[in-house]
């Protein structure tokens, strides 16, 4: 993501091939284009899911090769670009000496020749965005009949790093499993986002329909701290 490609600037502002580099011709630096990328997500995405995906990228990007100050500048430029403040985005890019061979933030280089690539989801929302479910809609989910289905243990990995096994029933919806997790860990259902094989699970999906393999770990992203922490003894 931030690997050095062995390129250098010349006096005209272009990027030339380095005789000892990879032989990749990067082309002339271009001003940032105003057109936003249009893309479609693999699954309909809510605003909250998009924010989480972006946060995950910006939290991990500086861990790759490249300079943190450049990542910070690119994050600020991406925010300005999406907010239609094109002049500010260009000023940030120029101030950090960032080169755009194609006039897009999807491929950038710093003055040392390090390459930085921003995913399109950091620059614009997908064309298949959907609205967040409201609390009123959630109330429409019917309760499963008592003791219906069969009982099993579902392995969860929380965003806090904690692993646990949650006792669930095959007729449970994702929302009811969120309520079970709320009872066990104190995290409100609205603050939980469940993912199976990278796919977000909606509240109305039933466990028996998901066909989650035994011992498969379901990821749970939580947007609030755990409630009622265990007191520390003196």
From Swiss-Prot:
Keywords: Cytoplasm. InterPro entries: DC-UbP/UBTD2_N (IPR032752), DC-UbP/UBTD2_N_sf (IPR038169), Ubiquitin-like_dom (IPR000626), Ubiquitin-like_domsf (IPR029071), UBTD1/2 (IPR039869). It is found in: Cytoplasm. The keyword Cytoplasm applies. Residues 9-21 have a biased composition (Polar residues). Residues 32-41 have a biased composition (Basic and acidic residues). Coiled coil: none annotated. Residues 152-227 form the Ubiquitin-like domain. One of its GO terms (cellular component) is cytoplasm. Residues 1-46 are annotated as: Disordered. Pfam families: UBD, ubiquitin. This is Ubiquitin domain-containing protein 2. It comes from Bos taurus (Bovine).
């Amino acid at each position: 993501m931030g690997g050095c490609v062995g390129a250098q600037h010349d006096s005209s502002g272009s990027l030339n091939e380095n005789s000892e580099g990879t032989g990749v011709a990067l082309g002339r630096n271009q001003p940032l284009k105003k057109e936003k990328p249009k893309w479609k997500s693999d699954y309909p995405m809510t605003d909250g899911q998009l924010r989480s995906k972006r946060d995950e990228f910006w939290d991990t990007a500086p861990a790759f090769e490249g300079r943190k100050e450049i990542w910070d500048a690119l994050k600020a430029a991406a925010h300005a670009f999406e907010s239609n403040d094109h002049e500010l985005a260009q000023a940030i890019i120029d101030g950090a000496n960032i080169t755009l061979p194609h006039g897009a933030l999807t491929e950038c280089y710093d003055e040392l020749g390090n390459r930085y690539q921003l995913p399109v989801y950091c620059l614009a929302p997908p064309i298949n965005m959907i609205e967040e479910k409201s609390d009123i809609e959630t109330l429409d989910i019917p309760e499963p009949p008592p003791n219906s289905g069969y009982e099993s243990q579902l392995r969860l990995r929380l965003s806090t790093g904690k692993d646990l096994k949650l006792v669930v029933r095959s007729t449970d919806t994702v929302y009811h499993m969120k309520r079970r997790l709320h009872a066990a860990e104190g995290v409100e259902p609205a603050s939980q986002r469940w993912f199976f094989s990278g796919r977000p699970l909606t509240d109305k999906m039933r466990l028996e329909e998901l066909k989650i393999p035994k011992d498969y770990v379901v990821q749970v992203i939580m947007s609030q701290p755990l409630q009622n922490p265990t007191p520390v003894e003196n």
